[in-house]
A protein has these predicted regions:
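Substrate-recognition "cap/lid" segment bordering the active-site pocket of phosphatases
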Residues: 139-151
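Ubiquitin-like/PB1-type beta-grasp interaction modules and other compact soluble beta-rich domains
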Residues: 226-305
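Active-site phosphate/pyrophosphate- and oxyanion-stabilizing loops and adjacent acidic/basic residues
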Residues: 55, 95, 151, 200, ...
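C-terminal binding/interaction regions
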Residues: 178, 182
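Compositionally biased, low-complexity segments
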Residues: 216-230
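Conserved N-terminal beta1-alpha1 strand-loop-helix module at the mouth
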Residues: 1-91, 99-126, 142-145, 159, ...
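Glycine-rich beta-strand-to-loop/alpha-helix junction loops that act as flexible
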Residues: 130, 163-167, 185-187, 305-306
């Protein structure tokens, strides 16, 4: 049975970024630093050599209890007993890969616009890559999707997504601010003299956002009076009206939760991010986030393909 997919820092191999140092040496440093999912990406090696690399890397990742994903090749993933495969848009369809791999292995796919993300989710992908967020040498010539697409994915996609492409210690917080909660890096980690240190730093930033999001969400519902996420909702049949500010305009509403307010504005099924008093509220928590009088809500709706 496939275990639930839960990761924060995704590291991809890139042997061209560390000449003179072996792949296993570099990847073990990343694992010591907290990488919790690893991908073998090698576009040049013959298939037999790729299988041997995957087997050696699988031994290493297994020691740390971390999944190994193989880029592009479901057959290599099977031969090396890897945990899954990562596909590109021009690779084998997700459904065909699932037929080969069975239900117990992970299937991820790169996406570059929201339509591809929606299609991947419908097809049964376990996670998607969102990028490249910034220009990157790993994908030369590929137009950056910017953090706007990250925000769209955060607003709409229900399966895990990982932001990738040009992400560094310097810009990671910008990507997290846009809504990513999982980051992927190649050159910034494996091309660094100290991959372990970079991983610890990036993971620290991710963890800070996870913790800060929980605290901010609890504080964001403290509007006119202190309340918590467990604050009682109005009893069924009770009708109350409150004044809130929605996208800069004062409005009177009977909505008890952020989800009900979104429904009043007919935002169901649309690519929307919601902020309550300046804090982004994850979409899955809208239904349990109570509204109080005097609050300020911002709905940001994304149009187009990212």
């Amino acid at each position: 049975m496939k275990r639930p997919l839960d990761f924060k820092l995704y590291v991809i191999t890139g042997e061209n970024y560390h000449p003179g140092r072996g792949m296993l040496e570099v990847m073990e440093a990343a694992l010591r630093g907290g990488a919790d999912i690893v991908q073998l990406r090698d576009k040049m090696s013959p298939k037999r050599e790729l299988i041997e690399k995957a087997k050696r890397l699988k031994e290493l990742t297994a020691k740390y209890g971390v999944p190994l994903i193989v880029n592009d090749h479901p057959d290599v993933a099977l031969a090396a007993d890897a945990d899954g495969v990562h596909l590109g848009q021009d690779d084998l369809p997700i459904e065909a890969a699932r037929e080969l791999l069975g239900p117990g292995r992970i299937i991820g796919i790169s996406t570059h616009r929201i339509e591809q993300a929606r299609a991947a989710e419908r097809a049964g992908a376990d996670y998607i890559g969102v990028g490249p967020v910034y220009p990157t040498g790993t994908k030369p010539g590929r137009k950056a999707v910017t953090t706007a697409y990250v925000a769209q994915a955060a607003a709409e996609i229900g399966i895990p997504f990982v932001a990738i492409g040009g992400i560094t210690e310097t810009n990671a917080e910008e990507v997290l601010w846009a809504g990513a909660r999982r980051l992927c890096a190649v050159s910034a980690i494996v091309g660094h003299d100290n991959p372990e240190s970079v991983c610890r730093n990036l993971l620290g930033k991710i963890n800070a956002w996870h913790l800060g999001e929980q605290v901010a969400l609890a504080e964001s519902v403290s509007l006119s009076v202190p309340v918590s996420l467990s604050a009682p909702m109005p009893a069924p049949g009770d009708v109350r009206e409150i004044d809130v500010v929605v996208n800069g305009r004062s409005e009177r509403t009977q909505a008890a939760t952020l989800l009900e307010l979104a429904a009043e504005y007919k935002l169901e099924g649309r690519s929307v991010i919601a902020e309550l008093d300046g804090a982004v509220v994850p979409r899955q928590l809208w239904g349990e986030t109570p509204l109080q009088g005097g609050g300020s809500v911002e709905f940001v709706h994304f149009v187009g393909g990212g």
